[in-house]
């Protein structure tokens, strides 16, 4: 019963009475309706209830049609029915995972991709032909021969090489970074980009709207003041204009003249210059890539720039003819909450399924979904050596807590988990059988596999794979055992288990 002692059937009668008095008393209909709506009776509550039901029903229909993960669909549906307004607001902010972007087809030349050189056939080891075929179906891209890859450790090695490449660019510079700070190294990069533009290069820069600083990142403001074309990915300081708060571009890409590319895990910040002993040093691994596969990297950037700025970049400045630069075979794999959803995760599953002797990976954050956990467990069960290296302490304490509550099935099934001692290592690498490897920006968590826009490169090359193998095995000094997990105090285990429920969004 509502205030004023009204009953449900009193509402229409009360409305009729108010309208009658309005006609006799000279009130307008609007004034009469205002009196009726603010009258402390049941009808007002009924209208609010009906509105809540309609909102919950509409959002529930959207959830049923869009959410493929059953647990996620059940959770969101329950929340919007328990609290229509609050639940709907959260769903619009964090629950919408798909973004419509204009597709841009890869423009391959029909017969020749290299300067006066017939396109070299990309061959892969016979044992990996099924994996090659599967990834081609997933990405709709071919493996490309003629690739050369150089490995850099930390910003100490990567930054000088990147800055030298920017200084040598003659036609175009494309840069995309999740974190781009306006600190000493950030300002050095900004100055280099400005100089490239001043000597006639076309320069385009993408910063993530969350990773580089929410309220108009300082590096973005400095670039704009200097006249350097720079865009923020999925960003607005107005919440109602930014319904995709949870979706970010996590790519790290630098492409010079469409011929030389850098990618991997290194962001642009002073923390990555480990030799200078920053307050929180961040170790990492980055890669310089040359050869025809750079065209696939460039296409990934051009799609993002068209989405951010609405500008289609064309011509030889961005897409020149490319010559072989090495002997590696490679292919780009992009992933994101659009048409590319979960492509990197699917490639990882395919690679695990094709493994014959070893699976070795290092990642700063390890919270994969149950499918990938099960795949690793099954691989270990069939006798494959599976080694997973995670930081003892990452830069996100909550993720560390959730990880401890997530890995027990792996340890139970024979997967070896190792703790990488500080300083924190942000490197991401996967090596299979010492012959195939997967490098790039994606972490092994649900955010990278499903929510973020990511870019990885698969490489068929024993030399690089074994180098990454050695890099990963060198970290395998401190094992994490089930006894270690069981030794945690009960309250700590309870905290970790509770935080794990946030797995889809950590």
Question: What do these predicted ranges mean?
Answer:
Residues 6, 15-346, 350, 354, ...:
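N-terminal localization/anchoring segments of enzymes in phospholipid and broader phosphate metabolism
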Residues 10-11:
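Short hydrophobic alpha-helical segments enriched in small aliphatic residues
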Residues 348-358, 378-381:
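Long hydrophobic segments that form regular secondary structure
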Residues 365-386, 391-392, 396:
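Helical hairpin unit composed of two closely spaced alpha helices linked by a short loop
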Residues 417-421:
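Active-site donor-binding acidic/aromatic loop of nucleotide-activated sugar
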